[in-house]
């Protein structure tokens, strides 16, 4: 079972849904279950695709993409969303292209101890993402002041804020509908040496 509600397959998609599936294709040429979860209301997929691509795949992003994938993964850990963690830590791992470092980061995040793998502004961003995820009602100006003190620019803060906010949305979509990775090609990026479709 890939979800607790009906998901319309790519082969059964017609009209607007078929068009949305074409827009949602990954570099693997597949449509992940996170997008298929919208299949009964394809208009909601359009907004999801636009938001996802704007926070993780836009050319004006300044922070390293591997690190934004780490933010996505840490947010997903805090929300206990195995779907997003599976996909997005695979992305971080492929972008890092350093298995030992990726393993160390993954262990530190799972243990809730990002300071074991990060320092400086990267650590400050992870602390911010965790608080925004778990204690959103307690956010205050001081949280942003701490990011400034760590050397983060306002634009970088916005990038991390948007990735964290997006994954809080996506994690709730996935966990709330019981969406699994069954049938997905895990990760957005091809593995080193893997041919693009």
Which residues does each predicted region cover?
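Hydrophobic alpha-helical segments
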Residues: 1-197
